[in-house]
Amino acid sequence: MRRVRTTRLFQVACAAIVALASSAMSAHATSRIKDLANIEGVRQNQLIGYGLVVGLNGTGDTLNNIPFTKQSLQAMLERMGVNIRGATIRTGNVAAVMVTGNLPPFATQGTRMDVTVSALGDAKNLQGGTLLVTPLLGADGNVYAVAQGSLAISGFQAEGEAAKIVRGVPTVGRIANGAIIEREIEFALNRLPNVRLALRNADFTTAKRIAAAINDFLGVKTAEPIDPSTVQLSIPPEFKGNVVAFLTEIEQLQVDPDLAAKIVIDERSGIIVMGRDVRVATVAVAQGNLTVTISESPQVSQPNPLSQGRTVVTPRTSVGVTEDGKKFAVVKDGVSLQQLVDGLNGLGIGPRDLISILQAIKAAGAIEADIEVM
């Protein structure tokens, strides 16, 4: 009797947790415009540069195998007044690297940004290295920042004569605040007559809801959806020359986004992610596994003594076929995501089989969602 009561209490508790989770999801269904869209033109710019990392403990590039590292080292030393042309250079403490970073929007001259340093040659480990002065160029070929500093490596490598241990990626590192911005990208935000919002997930309904929320807040028709990914805003007269204040008011408005039903499948890892609006029509699902087992057990034939025979190995192969009992279930019309998952789990289906079943249901026209295979 106590066990039955405990089970019932557990079921009631689970039901309460599910109800609370459902109400929490409903309460947080809306999102800020700030989280749904970006301001067109306000973005990062990618920078790239080529440089040298020094101070490596014999884990740098092999100069005989990587000619550009040797040439870069010679050119750098010559700029400093050291002439080594014709000399034999034998060092494993230098590595050629590519330096990348993202120039933040509205970054001013003299501020700093993070950079990522990646080995370009056959360096084994960048641990303990220092990046020398490296100009970072934009897509237009201009220098926007200069990077230099000590690398922080998350991975490591240790090896001996007969064994080696590698953890993480020791040939990639980061330099926090390792680049100084030398050139600014001009963007006159306050002089714009209108501003465009670029939706992160294009959707007609969401674009219309964003425009409606902005117009209701301002009391005038200021926002207009142009396409499923763009909403154009006309700057009201009271905000002329103060676009920042206008956008500050707009981006805090709450909107209920409308997302298309989609199932994302990663076949390599077996991960399946389904949206809340996935619906399935009536469909019957049967699943069974056919397993073929082939085992090799070679036998040794040993002749009797003085029989003029010889020892031979004879193959012996056994083949077995087993088929799991097929399980059959009917998924009713209009079931939700949770019901679909529960029904398929009730068949004892694993992630790999679930991928095939979802694709088959989609091919049968019974699933109302797009399937994206990664």
Curated annotation (Swiss-Prot):
Alphabetical keyword list: Bacterial flagellum, Periplasm, Signal
Presence of keyword Signal: yes
Lineage: superkingdom: Bacteria
GO biological process, one term: bacterial-type flagellum-dependent cell motility
Leader sequence residues: 1-29
Primary location recorded for the protein, binned into one broad class: periplasm
Matches recorded under Pfam families: FlgI (PF02119)
Keyword Signal: yes
Cellular localisation: Periplasm; Bacterial flagellum basal body
InterPro entries in the cross-refs: Flag_FlgI
Single GO MF descriptor: structural molecule activity
One Gene Ontology cellular component: outer membrane-bounded periplasmic space
Subunit (UniProt): The basal body constitutes a major portion of the flagellar organelle and consists of four rings (L,P,S, and M) mounted on a central rod.
Purpose: Assembles around the rod to form the L-ring and probably protects the motor/basal body from shearing forces during rotation.
Cross-referenced PANTHER family: FLAGELLAR P-RING PERIPLASMIC PROTEIN FLGI, FLAGELLAR P-RING PROTEIN
Family: Belongs to the FlgI family.
Protein name as catalogued: Flagellar P-ring protein
Organism this protein belongs to: Bradyrhizobium sp. (strain BTAi1 / ATCC BAA-1182)
